[in-house]
Amino acid sequence: MEETDLTWHDSSVSREKRQQLMGHRGCVAWFTGLSGSGKSTVANLVDASLHAGGVHSFLLDGDNVRHGLTASPQMLATHGEEFASRFGLAFSPQDREENIRRVGATAELLASAGLVTLVALVSPYRKDRDAVRQRVGEQIGPQAFLEIFMDTPLEICEERDPKGLYRKARAGELARMTGIDDPYEDPLKPEIHLRGAEFSATELADQVVQELLQRIGREP
């Protein structure tokens, strides 16, 4: 079968009908920032707040998706070496790009179904984040994507170091650590700019919730 043999099939249930059933519009809220910046913490608080307010939401966390959707070659070893090598994703620039592409495509599908889809990934490269923005914009609309920059200084992220990754990177035990020997490209014009060193996680989550409620057509 060739790509030309594939045909897009429109659903008999439109996006508008799904949104009407949900009571709000779907969107993708993409949290990006260094490891330890607070992305997952804030995203989880946002998810809980939305759920408590009757908003249908779902969180795609970077570590969680690495256990399945974007699993590493090591995690796929039981499928055989060739399979693991072909489909497993490590942390090279190319693998990071595919990681973001897979998660972005999944997030777009969830948002199309009417869910407020929260994504918490380091996603260090600007072009990869922009590619997701473009995909969501083309499939749903430009207002359906929000880039949320979790702007926490590297020294604070290193002090927190909840997974011990910075310690390993500084000791030469871990390669391709974003912020140490792999670059992080700050967003140029994020929809929401969170300063992780200046506010509590709860305060930051409140900022995000207020913006999201306006975006999806719900009163704050």
Please describe what each predicted stretch is.
Residues 68, 75-78, 85-90, 102-170, ...:
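ATP-dependent NMP and nucleoside kinases share a basic, alpha-helical "lid"
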